[in-house]
Amino acid sequence: MKSGFVSIIGRPSTGKSTLLNSICEHQISIISSIPQTTRNKIKGIFTDKRGQIIFIDTPGFHLSKKQFNIALMHNVHSAIKETELILYVIDIQDKPGIEENEILTIISKSKINFLVVINKIDIQKTKEREIMIFLEEKGIKKDNIIKISAEQKINIEEIKDKIYENLQEGPLYYPEEYYTDQEMNLRTSEIIRGVTIKKLKEELPYSLYIEIEILEDRKNKLFIKANIIVAVESQKGIIVGKGGKGIKTIGEEARKIISEIFEKKCDLFLQVKLRKNWNKNPKLIKNLIN
């Protein structure tokens, strides 16, 4: 039996979280077209008769010098150090740039085995030729490259096969039925944050986080009270919406997902609260992403 830890890295919006969810066959990580949706190192677990793979989904790699983004990049680097294999995900629509050079340099210095995963092959207009030339120039062997569509689940089984080829014999780190090690509080807050980001599109994704005040199982029914925290007063109105319609829609969708995932009915109560300039508070940022 084989087992091991695998980090998933790549630029923002390359489909890392979609890949994780597709392999593990559960919604573990937030999926959004908005860059930098993933903040924490999210673990997904896949177990079959061959063994167990523990995936670590990481924030999108970029070179921004903003305080919040530097903290996110710390998560990327620490995830790489924890793993036996790296999945480097490239969006087939993106022409290789500075980030690709930087990521391959980091991978090379780590001395860790890696696979290059070219994602979104179901899309018509691509930069496949440029990507393949770039990888060839970097000395990446074709055996280390796999082309997939995480969203359409094309070549997902092939990825699993390739991963197991690169892992050593080892124990099961988690019980077979586990597909994530996230605590209920974190999973719940990530669901609410994901729904909020989806509804707001590009307006506020970096300026909000979710604070769970109460999460209780009351007679096989979840009771949840949560706050959507924003950094600026004007952002409250954007989330609440006209006549409270915005926050009501967020609550309804989040409640449905929470009920489906935890297989229990759910009472969810949401409020929007201001915590001025929270995204410039180093201590709070550290707590949120670790």
From Swiss-Prot:
Where is the segment annotated G5? 148-150
Chain spans, region G3: 57-60
Q: Which domain of life is it from?
A: Bacteria
Which membrane topology describes this protein? Peripheral membrane protein
Q: Which residues form the signal peptide?
A: none
What's an example GO cellular component term for this entry? plasma membrane
Q: Which GO terms describe its molecular function?
A: ATP hydrolysis activity; GTP binding; GTPase activity; ribosomal small subunit binding; small ribosomal subunit rRNA binding
Q: In this protein, which residues make up the domain named KH type-2?
A: 200-276
Q: Where is this region: G4?
A: 119-122
Keywords assigned:
Cell inner membrane, Cell membrane, Cytoplasm, GTP-binding, Membrane, Nucleotide-binding, Ribosome biogenesis, RNA-binding, rRNA-binding
Sequence similarity: Belongs to the TRAFAC class TrmE-Era-EngA-EngB-Septin-like GTPase superfamily. Era GTPase family.
Question: What is the name attached to this protein's record?
Answer: GTPase Era
Q: From which source organism is this entry?
A: Borrelia turicatae (strain 91E135)
The record lists the lineage as: Bacteria, Pseudomonadati, Spirochaetota, Spirochaetia, Spirochaetales
